[in-house]
Amino acid sequence: MSPQTETKASVGFKAGVKDYKLTYYTPDYETKDTDILAAFRVTPQPGVPPEEAGAAVAAESSTGTWTTVWTDGLTSLDRYKGRCYHIEPVAGDENQYICYVAYPLDLFEEGSVTNMFTSIVGNVFGFKALRALRLEDLRIPPSYTKTFQGPPHGIQVERDKLNKYGRPLLGCTIKPKLGLSAKNYGRAVYECLRGGLDFTKDDENVNSQPFMRWRDRFLFCAEAIFKSQAETGEIKGHYLNATAGTCEEMMKRAVFARELGVPIVMHDYLTGGFTANTSLAHYCRDNGLLLHIHRAMHAVIDRQKNHGIHFRVLAKALRMSGGDHIHAGTVVGKLEGERDITLGFVDLLRDDFIEKDRSRGIYFTQDWVSLPGVLPVASGGIHVWHMPALTEIFGDDSVLQFGGGTLGHPWGNAPGAVANRVALEACVQARNEGRDLAREGNEIIREASKWSPELAAACEVWKEIKFEFEAMDTL
């Protein structure tokens, strides 16, 4: 060891354990434009001060370990450490705090959501000093955002590819999700598309099972797409799920979809992983495929209010990793989603610049610069009576996806698709004429049903269906 190294390593080194807050709690720190900022909901163990808990989070998610180590002297910890720079109590929740942590940009590999999450949430959630920990939001600086490709195409490019403007897009998940043969599955796709839907969809767990291998499904769905396009004169698509057990197999399925000439494929981005998702997104941009993203497994991570990762963070991560659509709740259907919070992360998916707004759960102003937007998908327990509310809540730049609300129509799949298309067109026309969808929605649907027997039948079937449960994801 050289004398210079010996001197550097030994200066200021004292073995033992010291409080995290002495090094990582820095309330006077002024954040930099290049810092990645995180807002954590921290519940310390009894007797642990919030300053120590916040500093522990900053340390364990950056440069810290449980004891002083002599190699600290070989680098500049002050340059690379995370800093807990602000702490505020959570109103109405005793012994719970929002701790704000700033991370220097040099801690993260460029263009890697995988590395970002491994650093920020990879280890600290098991820390004994904390009873619970939840990552509520991240501020991604433009200097880091620009290292990502993001969505393969984005909202405007997708509309141009589909030649569809001025309304939400309509979709349907094929049911039953498991058990159909490839030919019967393709038949259901064809009926829904010719009835007026823009898209149909593989469910998240449709991959390549014994009853329906992926190649057979792709072939029959492609046939359904091209036949329905010829009949309707509209561009159609089916979300062909390319998710697989290996990245190589996933890419093989995406390549086959491109060779068939279909417009869109699908990926389960949380179960498939961010590395696989980013690879697929790059392939889709290079080869003209749209990419639909399912968030299977998200509620395991984001549903508990005190522990985990909020979906707004997972949504930001998806926009960075890449996807043209992502499921985002419905507010009115069977799946979790409170209105203001849902609209907060919907804006984070679609807009270029989003101001801080704590009333919608947005802790930081986010500037996406030139990163393309993502279409939010409303799916889960919705039907024609929900159409006015969905159109009013999500606006034109969205995908409204009715599975049971299409295939459950008493006259069949195609009439179910007709009912949804008529309901949507009626709501869009009423909105464009200045009518209040929130107040007059039911009347608008009833008026339209006079001219559409398919819609009238759907209205009768689902007139009593409601999902009235209180959302768990509240501010």
Swiss-Prot record:
The disulfide bond which can form in the large chain dimeric partners within the hexadecamer appears to be associated with oxidative stress and protein turnover. The modification N6,N6,N6-trimethyllysine is found at K14. Pfam families: RuBisCO_large, RuBisCO_large_N. The modification N6-carboxylysine is found at K201. It is found in: Plastid, Chloroplast. The keyword Iron-sulfur does not apply. Binds 1 Mg(2+) ion per subunit. Residues 1-2 form a propeptide. It catalyses: 2 (2R)-3-phosphoglycerate + 2 H(+) = D-ribulose 1,5-bisphosphate + CO2 + H2O; D-ribulose 1,5-bisphosphate + O2 = 2-phosphoglycolate + (2R)-3-phosphoglycerate + 2 H(+). Mg(2+) binds at K201, D203, E204. Signal peptide: none annotated. The record marks K334 as: Transition state stabilizer. Belongs to the RuBisCO large chain family. Type I subfamily. The basic functional RuBisCO is composed of a large chain homodimer in a 'head-to-tail' conformation. In form I RuBisCO this homodimer is arranged in a barrel-like tetramer with the small subunits forming a tetrameric 'cap' on each end of the 'barrel'. RuBisCO catalyzes two reactions: the carboxylation of D-ribulose 1,5-bisphosphate, the primary event in carbon dioxide fixation, as well as the oxidative fragmentation of the pentose substrate in the photorespiration process. Both reactions occur simultaneously and in competition at the same active site. This is Ribulose bisphosphate carboxylase large chain. The gene is rbcL.
